[in-house]
Amino acid sequence: SGQTSSFRPDEKIMTSAYWTKDKKEGLHIPVARKALNRILQKSLGIERDEKGLLLSLSEVQELRAAAGGLYDESATIDENDAFPKSLLLAEAILKSALNRKESRGAHTRSDYPDEQESYRKTTVAVYKNGGIHISLAAIEGDPDGH
């Protein structure tokens, strides 16, 4: 399409999510949650492209790796429980968006501007064996069987 992506890695967002206290490195959940919000806002808007989605997926995976097994003593039990799940969900959404190589409804892929009949299906994300797997499934009740 000749367009270049406006997405760039944001080192400030990523590094501000980390903190050091008493020589114990960890993730500060309130700051990391803001970083996650910024990452998703820049790539999951109405107009998207592969480059921006891949960059955001990489940043979410980096946050997810950093959050694995860590406990933020300044956050609540619920925040410590919910944040890794939010990262997993964010990864599933980004992988789903990457898998759909078309524009449909309100979401436009600048690198795939046309609607594709083969994508007239629902996206299914499954967490299995430590990874997220994306597939397409027929829409129940679709008379054309797509």
Model regions and ranges:
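Glycine- and aromatic-enriched mobile tails/lids
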Residues: 1-146
